[in-house]
Amino acid sequence: MRSLPGMTIICPADDVEARAAVRAAYEMQGPVYLRFGRLAVPVFHDEANYHFEIGKGEQLTEGNDIAIVATGLMVNEARKAAETLAAEGIHARVLNIHTIKPLDEDIILKAAKECGKIVTAEEHNVIGGLGEAICSLLSEKLPTPVRRVGVQDKFGCSGPAWDLL
């Protein structure tokens, strides 16, 4: 979908963000692809105070040792990973990138500059998704080591959603 001209791609992290994304998509001109996972995820946004803006990521945790950049249901997994790393003395910055296209280049470049390494996490094929978009951005503007976590390039299987990840 990223290769389609003018396409907006949104992958919300929780119910509050999903509702806001649907409202924003309704107001947009042009095609929008809203990607929702099958699994129930914890709600961590406060609906009363949450502001959704297409193309603007969200920093969820402080940290300069590594940046974990996630989308969709993997945002909550990234938050849990940051807690695990903190217990080991590693301070991870977690970014919620709900809009894969257009990509929030500023927040990603800032994280790359300040952290020096990035892990991307998505419940999507590593080809054509968030990780590839970030690798493309960084290769041109700020070469930074990136490790992509996602579905490898193979045909899908059927089964319980967590087992498939």
Q: Where on the chain are the PLM-derived regions?
A:
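Glycine- and acidic-residue-enriched helix-capping/beta->alpha junction motif
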Residues: 24-31, 134-137
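Divalent-metal (often Zn2+) His-rich catalytic cores of metallo-beta-lactamase-fold enzymes
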Residues: 34
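Conserved thiamine diphosphate
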Residues: 1-27
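Charged, amphipathic alpha-helical interaction segments
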Residues: 23, 30, 83-87
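Thiamine diphosphate
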Residues: 37-165
